[in-house]
């Protein structure tokens, strides 16, 4: 399963170092793994990116082959400009891929670690 791991606030540097060492050891063993690590400075920063509508959009993209932002807006029955803005924000955060044509979410889960 491909996973996006999100770290929020606190000890992001320590977590990034731990993730690097863990990935290094897995690569040395020849383990195959597919995960992406993202970091947000605060809960507010994460909440600005992962709104309810954007989570709905991510779930739809994960389950369907989406040829274009226009097709996605039509499928979600939402205004094109709002969907376009959401796709741009999610792509900028590293949660969507639009480079290969269409709109893709190449992961099955998002795991979040929030420092308090």
Each PLM stretch: what is its role?
Residues 1-27:
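General nucleic-acid-binding
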Residues 28-56:
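Short alpha-helical segments that sit at the start of domains
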Residues 44-53, 68, 98-116:
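Short, cationic-aromatic polyanion-contact patches
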Residues 52-66:
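Short amphipathic alpha-helical interface segments
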Residues 69-76:
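A short acidic, leucine-rich amphipathic alpha-helix
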Residues 72, 83, 87-91:
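Basic amphipathic alpha-helical segments that dock to polyanions
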Residues 94:
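Glycine-centered, phosphate/nucleic-acid-interacting loop/turn motifs that mediate DNA/RNA or nucleotide
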């Amino acid at each position: 399963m491909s996973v996006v791991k999100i770290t929020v606030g606190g000890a992001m540097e320590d977590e990034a170092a731990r993730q690097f060492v863990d990935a290094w050891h897995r690569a040395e063993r020849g383990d195959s793994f597919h995960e992406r690590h993202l970091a947000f400075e605060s809960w507010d920063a994460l909440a600005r990116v992962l709104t309810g509508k954007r989570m709905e959009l991510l779930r739809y993209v994960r389950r369907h082959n989406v040829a274009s932002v226009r097709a996605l807006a039509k499928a979600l029955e939402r205004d094109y400009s709002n969907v376009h803005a959401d796709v741009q924000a999610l792509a900028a955060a590293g949660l969507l891929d639009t480079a290969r044509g269409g709109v893709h979410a190449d992961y099955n889960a998002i795991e979040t670690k929030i420092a308090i």
